[in-house]
Design a protein with these regions (language model features):
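Conserved mid-core segment of classical short-chain dehydrogenase/reductases
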Residues: 96-111, 154-157
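Residue(s) in the substrate-gating loop at a strand-loop-helix junction
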Residues: 145
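C-terminal helical subdomain
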Residues: 185, 193, 197-235
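Conserved glycine-rich Rossmann-like NAD(P)H-binding loop of the short-chain dehydrogenase/reductase
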Residues: 35-54
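Active-site helix of classical SDR
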Residues: 125, 161
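Rossmann-fold cofactor-recognition segment
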Residues: 58-74
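Conserved glycine-rich cofactor-binding loop
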Residues: 23-24
Length: 254
């Protein structure tokens, strides 16, 4: 499931977290997993915060709903002003427009995926790095995909954006090491969410992905590979990366 020990582990119990894209799928599972581990406060954010009303109502005083579109600098600035106590930043929000690189009609999907999957997390890391430093270092979790490490042509532009986000994660890890911030790359295989509805089973339950990510935080791990698909592909990439690439190259855009 995981690789490589990072900075000292962070305890979830009693911590303050911010989760992007918290209204459904893995993001909602993150909120539930943080609650189960005793987080003191969870800023649950989404572009449409009304979709978080039920969570905030059930967990008054702990779950705080927050309007946040990570492609909008003004939203990020507002969140950084309002959430000065954050110790754990979970960059979960993302999109998959299921587009190829050449087969797509234009570059719109590729640009949108880079904006949300790369520039959004980068902007969040930049805004919250000083906040994490002021609160003892804390941790950043970047939800990526095993496809950050190898391209699946049917989702070609998604894979490119996730590869960029993996490189971002490594760079941010290096820059924030001196302030004691753990930066975790989470790279699952297919997860059973609306975003991956067209991907064939087996798919990992989103709750399992969130739990594995938080296990990584509490163990001080830099890379986490939730589920059998991710761990198997990671081993394949270590042994014969070209063979994995050739195998995935058969899955072309429709």
């Amino acid at each position: 499931m995981s690789l490589q020990k990072g900075n000292p582990a962070m305890e979830i119990k009693g911590s303050v977290a911010l989760v992007t894209g918290a209204n459904r799928g893995i993001g909602r599972s993150f909120v539930e997993a943080l609650l189960a581990r005793g987080a003191a406060k969870i800023y649950a954010s989404a572009r449409r915060p009304e979709r978080l009303a039920d969570l905030a109502e059930r967990h008054k005083g702990i779950v705080v709903s927050l309007k946040l579109d990570i492609t909008q600098p003004a939203d990020i600035s507002t969140a950084a002003r309002q959430c000065r106590d954050v110790q754990l930043l979970v960059n979960n929000a993302g999109i998959n427009l299921q587009a190829g690189l050449i087969a797509a009609n234009d570059l719109a999907a590729a640009r949108a995926e880079m904006e949300t999957n790369y520039f959004g997390p980068l902007a969040m890391c930049r805004a919250f790095a000083p906040i994490l430093a002021a609160n003892g270092g804390g941790a950043v979790v970047n939800m990526l995909s095993i496809l950050a490490r190898v391209n699946l042509p049917m989702y070609g532009s998604l894979c490119a954006s996730k590869a960029a986000a993996l490189s971002l994660t490594q760079g941010v890890r290096g820059e924030l090491a001196k302030q004691g911030t753990l930066v975790v790359a989470v790279m699952p295989g297919a997860v059973d969410t609306e975003m991956e509805r067209n991907f064939p089973p087996p798919k990992l339950p989103p709750a399992d992905a969130a739990r594995a990510a938080l296990d990584g935080v509490e163990q001080g791990l830099e890379e986490v590979y939730p589920g059998d698909m991710a761990s198997g592909m990671s081993q394949g990439l270590a042994h014969d990366p070209k063979a994995v690439e050739k195998d995935l190259a058969k899955y072309l855009p429709r």
